[in-house]
Amino acid sequence: MPGDKVIMKSGEWKSQFIHFKGKGTAEKPITLTAETKGSVLLTGNSNLKIDGEWLVVDGLSFKNGFSLKDDVVVFTKTTTNSRLTNTSIENYNPVDKTLDYKWVSLYGHHNRVDHCSITGKNHQGTTLVVWLDDKPNYHQIDHNYFGPRPELGANGGETIRIGTSAFSMNDSYRTVQNNIFDKCDGEVEIISIKSGFNKILNNLFYECAGTVTFRHGNNSEVSNNYFIANNVTNSGGVRIIGENQKVYGNYLYKVAGRTLRSAISVMNAYEKPALNDYWQVKNADIQNNIIVGAREAFVLGSGKDNDRTLAPDGVNISNNYIINPTTLLVTQDEPKNLKMQNNQVEGASIVTGFVKMGNDLQMSDGIWQKKTEIKKPFWLATAIGPEWKKDHRSFIFK
């Protein structure tokens, strides 16, 4: 009934298959919670299915086990306005690393995953997937800690995927905000955007060997994120594919990758792409980013080969700040309708579209920031992950 609370007794719950089903209301959600947050340990082959409306799951811990085949936590296709919060999934790995299951699967619409810790996935399958159909889902993923994920050595090691190739021309309206991605090295795509109208806002990507990739779909935005790469091998920034993508206000520090893993990579495309191929970049807008110590700050027409022959059309690179790059600009294929203006650079030769660095920037909290827009990085001012899991993490600039 609306307002009901189901309290799980503290201790180990081994191989539990929990089907949390109900219909709450906005004013009176139904809650499944731990007697003491973090003290309910779901071990063995436990799984959780969230199935209904206005449901809240709070304070659980999955550890010392693995799933036999099903995803660990699933929001069902009919689930709406429901929430997974203050919960941990840690090292929930099978012996067989080729076994594919996701740790969180989001179906339905208007659901939220927040203040969780999801760390240590080392087997096949994306960590968290938003599954799309022909309608927008408006999910929200915020204030989570996504901990280290080692390189998988195959496709399917993303930390987050939004959509699938089959529905990539549909819109998701999904927000990923105020999360920490710490050494998420599963594959080249840390976040793989495969749908339209998504926002990746104000996240920290710390020493990750990968990129945030506009893989399929159009009209998405990656803005005000922090990529603190510290020259880690294969670290990357943002990879652009598709139409009307926006890359604004990001801070990229010592990104060591090249071409597809450069600080900002604008890709070439197939002339007649299938849904799962590389679509032409059109009207990319890249502004107000601060790039410090990158191996390659910008790569245009990246990935050009015998198949990817179609250059970007309409690329605006304006009002960015680039400090001490190894290489400022690489052009693998010349975009049509390229606009580059008012970009300020220090520590590299001036080329068309770039001018000598002025005095717009100021160092604050170890980060170069615009003097008119000084702010404290969110992870220094906001609680991330479960309230009961006191991890002493520090994210330093090297």
UniProtKB/Swiss-Prot annotation:
Record-annotated membrane-spanning stretches: none
Reactions performed catalytically: Eliminative cleavage of alginate to give oligosaccharides with 4-deoxy-alpha-L-erythro-hex-4-enuronosyl groups at their non-reducing ends and beta-D-mannuronate at their reducing end
EC number(s) from the headed UniProt entry: 4.2.2.3
InterPro entries documented for this protein: Pectin_lyas_fold (IPR012334), Pectin_lyase_fold/virulence (IPR011050), PL-6 (IPR039513)
Top-level taxon of origin: Bacteria
Keyword terms of this UniProt record: Lyase, Signal
One annotated GO molecular function: poly(beta-D-mannuronate) lyase activity
CDD domains named among the record's database cross-references: PL-6
Family: Belongs to the polysaccharide lyase 6 family.
Protein name: Alginate lyase
The species this protein was found in: Pseudomonas sp. (strain OS-ALG-9)
Gene that produces this protein: aly
